[in-house]
């Protein structure tokens, strides 16, 4: 059984008028930023808030909740002889808010000469996140991408000179330049690019089932777009490329293009 399954609790939820099958298992936290792995070997189709989920041959499926996900969602499972519906109660997460005033304006908002470059970078990233990769096996355990100190957490937000910036969408691990970066799970490299304004050197990997991981501010990139990688494979090294103040890895995890909390997905830190 995977570390994820060993560490996570099976949560008891509020059932709809239809009794939900005892054969359905859930692993994960029903909380904003959380990700759930479900399993039912008899399921024919599964829907999360009307979105049809991909089912593995073993009956596994995965879905997640963004930073500000609504309180209630619905999961529907179609069987050969019936349909069952479950109402999901999503707990609210608390996020750190930090205010910093007196910064030079260029550190808060980039100048207009950079707008076109930033726009093109975002288009490249959006294209990669929109790519589909199918896998027969749904990843159920995930390894930490690098050794180091956690220097930034999911959901936190800065207010710079009174201007609200986008919430922090991932996990920061501070470590010296050259520290190896590993893929958290097996998958296909959807993007491997250097020199983007905000992200610097960047790799995006698709793991199937609408799940993707992004690694940015890298020094070296050891993979190319289209490569297949194994879990734990070194894909590059930590750097300080892009818009950073020191060497670190910033990693995002996306489900269905929604950022989820990487710490709720990864194994216990060794």
Task: State what each model feature region is.
Residues 2-11:
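Sec-dependent signal peptide recognition
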Residues 16-18:
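N-terminal signal peptide c-region/cleavage motif recognized by signal peptidases
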Residues 21-94:
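Cationic-aromatic interfacial patches
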Residues 87-199:
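Surface-exposed, glycine-biased beta-strand/turn segments
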Residues 153, 176, 192, 218-221, ...:
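Residue-level recognition of beta-strand microenvironments
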Residues 173, 202-203, 230-242:
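Short hydrophobic beta/alpha edge segments that flank linear recognition/processing sites
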Residues 180-191, 223-238:
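Short, well-structured beta-strand-loop connectors
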Residues 184-219, 247, 252:
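Zn2+-dependent peptidoglycan hydrolase active-site motif and core
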């Amino acid at each position: 059984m995977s570390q994820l399954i060993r560490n996570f609790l099976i949560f008891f939820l509020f059932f709809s008028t239809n009794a939900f099958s005892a054969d359905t298992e859930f692993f994960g936290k029903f909380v904003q930023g959380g990700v759930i792995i479900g399993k039912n070997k008899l399921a024919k189709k599964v829907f999360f808030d009307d979105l049809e989920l991909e089912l593995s041959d073993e009956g596994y499926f995965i879905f997640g909740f963004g930073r500000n996900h609504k309180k209630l969602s619905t999961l529907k499972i179609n069987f050969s002889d019936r349909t069952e519906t479950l109402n999901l109660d999503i707990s609210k997460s608390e996020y750190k808010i930090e205010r910093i005033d007196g910064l030079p304006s260029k550190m808060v908002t980039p100048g207009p000469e950079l707008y076109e470059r930033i726009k093109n970078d975002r288009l490249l990233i959006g294209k990669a996140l929109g790519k589909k990769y199918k896998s027969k096996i749904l990843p159920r355990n995930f390894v930490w991408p690098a050794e180091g100190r956690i220097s930034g957490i999911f959901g936190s937000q800065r207010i710079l000179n009174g201007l609200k910036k986008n919430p922090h969408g991932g996990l920061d691990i501070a470590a010296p330049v050259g520290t190896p970066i590993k893929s958290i799970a097996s998958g296909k490299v959807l993007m491997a690019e250097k020199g983007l304004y905000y992200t610097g050197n960047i790799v995006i990997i698709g793991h199937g089932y609408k799940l993707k991981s992004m690694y940015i501010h890298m020094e070296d990139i050891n993979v190319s777009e289209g490569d297949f990688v194994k879990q734990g494979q070194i894909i590059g090294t930590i750097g300080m490329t892009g818009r950073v103040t020191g060497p670190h890895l910033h990693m995002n995890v996306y489900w269905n293009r929604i950022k989820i909390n990487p710490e709720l997905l990864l194994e216990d830190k060794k």
